[in-house]
Amino acid sequence: MDCVANFIEAKYHLAVAERMMKGYSKYPEKRFLIGVINELVRAISKLIRAFFIYENIKKGSLDKFLKKVAPKYLDDITIENLAKVIEIGQAQKVSPIEFAKGEKIILLIRGKYRFLTATRIDEFIKSFNTAISAFPKNFRQI
């Protein structure tokens, strides 16, 4: 796949995540927030692939992206939020306990309870929008 296709798929998954957040505001259920996290993880992985292709990096990893590629285009807060979303997405898949209380999701990750709020997930979406707009190609309007 080329750079443009990965970028378009990243924007698609972002749009799905944004629609799911709107759905959550109408029907506050845990599955919407979990869906938003999963869509953001997909979007971030597609955007990372697009950055690697743009930078002509053949074999990339998350660590390589965070240390070499991302600092060229993104601010520290955005980089931190993207890494946090991927970490949460991976942890959510293996978490033996996952439930919602109010607007919080509670996950058991490595023996510790972690709380994730809808507000924080919305911040992740905004950070990803920043990352999308920082992409160096001129096809952002797609």
Model segments located where?
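Long, charged low-complexity segments
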Residues: 57-134
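Amphipathic, well-ordered alpha-helical segments in soluble domains
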Residues: 12-20, 39, 46, 127, ...
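Short secondary-structure capping micro-motifs at structural edges
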Residues: 29-36, 69
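Short acidic alpha-helical/loop segments enriched in Asp/Glu that coordinate divalent cations
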Residues: 26-32, 52-64
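Short, hydrophobic, well-ordered secondary-structure elements
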Residues: 33-55
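Short acidic DE-rich linear segments
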Residues: 134-142
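Amphipathic alpha-helix face/heptad-repeat signature
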Residues: 3-13, 36-40, 120, 124
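Charged alpha-helical initiation segments
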Residues: 1-32, 140-141
